[in-house]
Design a protein with these regions (language model features):
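Active-site microenvironment for binding and transforming phosphate-containing groups
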Residues: 1-288
Length: 288
């Protein structure tokens, strides 16, 4: 796999692709944001479908234990990503996503949650930490990953934002938790809106469109296109960009994806493109 295999929405190099070679000889392609590497003490990635050992509709790097895949295969997939991130399974801390705006601070005692150990929490769509070595993990198949790096206070955050999280301003909630827990200044945070469904692929009903029109009053023309018959095209990328800028993220500190999961169903899992027959992609973020 190389970068040219993807269908990009434009030619900007917002995301790059690297090939990690595991100790067992397996190759693992991972997407990453160069902007977040401006702070050299951070590793970030977003997985593709390739480089794992799952089969069938889960081919091949599925990261979901709850959709019917072989648990041993899923665990091995996690191990490969952890290795690429310079860690082990016991370094990963997973969210428990239920489309909330709940954000939890995690520490070394949380290592392995969601992979090698049961999580003692539920309904957590965002994670933050200031502990080096922990690998934050959230999961996707069209929803929006949000990455946060505070290079001044050496803290990171990773959040899942579907349409409910976006209209609930999940990005703002994550920044507020980082401000409270680590004294982060939004003007110093580097942020990224990760691969997810684009506006051309994301048709929503009138009730969802109305919720966005109310929350993003004044920005309706930027995020919604009326298609008729009570249907609209919704731009989650622009919506999250607005949320993050409203929360104080500077334009030069923000990267917004140009890669759609639904446009690339052979390389990325997409719930909409597969009609629900799919695995999960993962966003990962680590302080070194």
């Amino acid at each position: 796999m190389d970068r040219e295999d993807f269908q990009w929405k434009n030619k900007e190099h917002i995301l790059e692709l690297e090939q990690f070679q595991g100790k067992k000889g397996q190759g693992l392609p991972l997407l990453y944001f160069p902007l977040l590497l401006a702070h050299t003490g951070v590793k970030n990635c977003f997985t593709t479908r390739e480089g794992g050992c799952s089969t069938g509709m889960f081919r091949s790097l599925n990261l979901s234990f709850t959709r019917g895949d072989n648990p041993q295969a899923v665990t091995e997939n996690y191990r490969r990503v952890a290795e690429a991130m310079g860690g082990t399974l016991s370094d990963i801390v997973c969210s428990d996503q239920t489309h909330t705006t709940n954000v939890r601070r995690v520490d070394r005692s949380c290592g392995g949650y969601g992979v090698t150990k049961e999580r003692p929490y539920t309904d957590v769509d965002g994670l933050v930490t200031d502990e080096p070595g922990l690998i934050l993990a959230t999961f996707y198949a069209d929803c929006v990953p949000l990455y946060f790096v505070d290079p001044i206070h050496h803290a990171i955050g990773l959040s899942h934002s579907g349409w409910r999280g976006t209209v609930g301003r999940m990005g703002q909630h994550t920044i507020e938790v980082m401000r409270r827990e680590f004294h982060s200044d939004p003007g110093e945070i580097l942020a990224a809106v990760g691969p997810s469904i684009c506006k051309d692929c994301y048709e929503v009903s009138e009730d969802v469109a109305s919720a966005f029109a109310k929350e993003f009053s004044g920005h309706e023309c930027e995020i919604l296109i009326e298609k008729g018959g009570g249907k609209y095209q919704l731009d989650l990328w622009k919506s999250n960009e607005i949320v993050l800028k409203d929360a104080g993220i500077l334009p030069e500190h923000l990267a917004v994806t140009n890669l759609c999961t639904c446009c690339n169903p052979n390389l990325l899992f997409s719930h909409r493109a597969s009609h629900g027959k799919r695995g999960n992609l993962g966003a990962f973020l680590k302080l070194v």
